[in-house]
Amino acid sequence: MEARMFWLLVVLLALASSSSAGEYVGLSANQCAVPAKDRVDCGYPQVTPEQCNNRGCCFDSSIXGVPWCFKPLQETECTF
């Protein structure tokens, strides 16, 4: 019985992590940390989060009056 509960927990955790990680497929959270005033529109009216992400863009609908689908920040390499 304990083994079944363990595997159930493993499956639930795997499902939860895959659904929450889907917001920025191929993008890091840092790339999508664009200040609202600096967002460059990357979508169109009524674009869904999935459609936006498929375009290689970030989606954040928590701030009204700014683009919700926007271009990510470009990651730069540090060279010393």
Curated annotation (Swiss-Prot):
Residues 1-21 form the signal peptide. The gene is TFF3. Keywords: Cytoplasm, Disulfide bond, Extracellular matrix, Secreted, Signal. It is found in: Secreted, Extracellular space, Extracellular matrix; Cytoplasm. Its main location: secreted. This is Trefoil factor 3. One of its GO terms (cellular component) is cytoplasm. It comes from the Eukaryota. It comes from Sus scrofa (Pig). Residues 30-73 form the P-type domain. The keyword Cytoplasm applies. The keyword Signal applies. Monomer. Homodimer; disulfide-linked.
